[in-house]
């Protein structure tokens, strides 16, 4: 089992770069889950009626959004859950789109596969993007199936020049099809290849540079993979080019024997918060998302995690409501003063 | 190894029904050389081992996740079938199913698309069918409920619109069933079995054999179903192809006689409008 290393020396981190125009800092968001639909939409509707929260111009010119009534600045939708013909899923997308900034996060782009790209999948994603008008479209730097058979898992790729060339060419085609840049997330992995010719961070960076796409930096995945492969999580965080980081993900993990597993069924761990702080010190305020996919807690509990992320961003960068970097913001100071479990909607 | 060869090997090992170690042994046994340990060396040449876990153990994490993830989704999709054939039976069913019908869709939503057909028709399921002859029908019914949940939306023909039309205007409308409506015929009484299965009882065949005609639909984002008599089933089948209401009434007159047909057609129409089954083609 790899020895855990001391993780932090914040003093050596550098100043935040300017954000790319297509990767605005949206603030802190959460992944929307079915069990929270009713509460989120009701809070949003109350906010839209002016009963709570702020109506904030998010800078997109598309619509005013109401964010503070829900305690976060934006939501992420899992793309495949909404790539269906109709019914409740698409009604949820329409309602969410009217009220909140959204991101679409996929798990099945299969960008690293040796199979051809699937036009039908890209058509469905494009159709969903037209409905959701997301600020980001993201997926994972991995493969999920081959020979038209899906494993429904985020399988790691060999870190070689050939794979970089292969994946980057596919990312460019996807971006051409969607008419925008996407961001790819580093995945948690439990195996690595003898053919690996570089570090994971060099691999992630090379693809982002070669394809001119963004990186969705999942801090929990950095930590999980670093633990599982005996690599240096701090060096990983420090090596990712800041201007390529479009978004950050935070989640919890579990232990299984000698390995860590990216289960998204626990709170974010202390060591991941510490790594996040290091990342934010270096990157500046970046759109940050809390993921919680299994053993899903109450919405209020999820907001506690979001508030922790917000507090770190504010403390490290000085970013807050009204900050020039914040295209969407919220009155987090009011929120963080509330007791856990007794959260009320906030009127700024 | 090329990327394709690497991914193909990993995919086969991960999807092997008895786990990675058994897959390696089977690979050796089926190779022309029958050389023991050859497949393991191939795996170890590809995937790094270290002091914490060897290559087979690391790949095994993905293999376990593959099966448990899909099993979890299918258990949620087919709760009454699980209730009928039990946890062990359902695990065996999913193992066999994935061998023949690996997931072809990017979304887990469609992983169970062919389960009912597999259960009803595949040779590998002959013993299961002999013990639970109704399981295939039950699976088909449960899948239809999933299918209508997120079927395409459309403008429902409501009572309000109909009440604003003159009788002759309504008679000219070409009516269809909405995309969110399914008509299904079963050889077994699936509704009783499904009710038992979803109430935590073990669905058992009660000897009430006989065809069941069922309509399944979505209304206000909820999924509904009800049984149909043969005549209403036939009427809805006509509407599924598109028909003017007048033509339907003429057909009903042939079936029921001139006296009974108008009243029956009006009753049907009232119910169909109330259930939100109809659209104007």
Predicted feature locations:
Chain B
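Low-complexity, glycine/alanine/valine/leucine- and proline-rich hydrophobic stretches
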Residues: 174-241
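Long, charge-rich, low-complexity alpha-helical segments
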Residues: 1-166, 221, 226-281
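Short, functional C-terminal segments
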Residues: 1, 143-196, 200-201
């Amino acid at each position: 089992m790899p020895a855990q290393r001391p993780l932090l020396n914040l003093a050596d981190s550098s100043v935040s770069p300017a954000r790319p125009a297509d990767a605005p800092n949206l603030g802190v968001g959460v992944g929307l889950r079915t069990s929270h639909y009713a509460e989120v939409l009701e809070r949003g509707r109350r906010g839209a009626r002016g009963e709570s929260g702020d109506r904030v111009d998010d800078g997109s010119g598309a619509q005013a959004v109401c964010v503070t009534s829900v305690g976060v600045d934006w939501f992420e939708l899992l793309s495949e859950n909404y790539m269906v013909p109709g019914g409740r899923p698409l009604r949820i997308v329409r309602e969410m789109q009217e009220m909140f900034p959204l991101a679409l996060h996929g798990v099945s782009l299969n960008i690293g596969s040796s199979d051809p790209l699937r036009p039908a999948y890209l058509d469905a994603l494009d159709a969903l993007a037209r409905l959701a008008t997301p600020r980001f479209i993201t997926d994972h730097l991995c493969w999920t199936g081959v020979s038209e058979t899906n494993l429904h898992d985020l399988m790691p790729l060999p870190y070689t020049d050939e794979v970089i060339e292969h994946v980057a060419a596919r990312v460019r085609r996807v971006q051409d099809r969607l008419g925008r840049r996407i961001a790819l997330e580093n995945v948690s992995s439990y195996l690595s290849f003898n053919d690996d010719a570089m570090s994971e961070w060099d691999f992630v960076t090379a693809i982002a540079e070669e394809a001119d796409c963004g990186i969705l930096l999942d801090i929990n995945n950095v930590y999980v993979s670093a633990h599982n492969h005996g690599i240096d999580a701090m060096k990983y965080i420090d090596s990712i080019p800041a201007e390529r980081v479009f978004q950050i993900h935070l989640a919890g993990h579990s232990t299984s024997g000698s390995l860590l597993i990216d289960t998204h069924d626990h709170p974010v761990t202390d060591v991941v918060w510490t790594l996040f702080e290091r990342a934010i010190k270096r990157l500046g305020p970046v759109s940050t998302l809390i993921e919680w996919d299994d053993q899903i807690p109450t919405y209020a509990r999820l907001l506690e995690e979001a508030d922790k992320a917000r507090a770190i961003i504010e403390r490290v960068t000085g970013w807050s409501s009204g900050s020039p970097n914040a295209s969407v913001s919220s009155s987090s100071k009011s929120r963080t003063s509330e007791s856990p479990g007794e959260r009320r909607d906030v009127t700024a | 190894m090329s990327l394709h060869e690497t991914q193909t090997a990993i995919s086969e090992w991960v999807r092997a029904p008895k786990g990675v170690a058994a897959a390696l042994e089977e690979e050796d046994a089926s190779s022309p050389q029958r050389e023991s340990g050859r497949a393991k060396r191939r795996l170890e040449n590809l995937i790094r081992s270290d002091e914490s876990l060897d290559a087979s153990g690391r790949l095994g994490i993905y293999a376990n996740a593959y099966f448990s993830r899909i099993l979890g989704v299918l258990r949620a999709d087919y709760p009454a079938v699980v209730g009928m054939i039990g946890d062990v039976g359902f695990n065996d069913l999913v193992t066999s199913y994935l061998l023949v019908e690996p997931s072809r869709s990017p979304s887990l939503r469609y992983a169970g698309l062919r389960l009912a057909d597999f259960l009803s028709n595949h040779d590998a399921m002959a013993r299961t069918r002999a013990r639970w002859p109704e399981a295939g029908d039950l699976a088909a019914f449960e899948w239809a409920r999933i299918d209508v949940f997120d079927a395409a939306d459309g403008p429902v023909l409501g009572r309000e619109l109909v009440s604003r039309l003159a009788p002759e205007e309504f008679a000219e409308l070409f009516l269809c069933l909405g995309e969110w409506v399914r008509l299904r015929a079963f050889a077994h009484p699936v509704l009783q079995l499904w009710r038992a299965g979803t109430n935590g009882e073990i669905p058992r065949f009660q000897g009430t054999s006989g065809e069941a005609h069922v309509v399944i639909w979505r209304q206000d984002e909820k999924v509904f179903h009800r049984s149909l008599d043969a005549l209403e089933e036939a009427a809805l089948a006509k509407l599924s192809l598109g028909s003017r209401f007048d033509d339907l009434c003429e057909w009903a007159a042939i079936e029921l006689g001139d006296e009974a047909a108008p009243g029956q057609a009006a009753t049907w129409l009232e119910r169909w409008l109330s259930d939100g089954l109809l659209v104007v083609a």
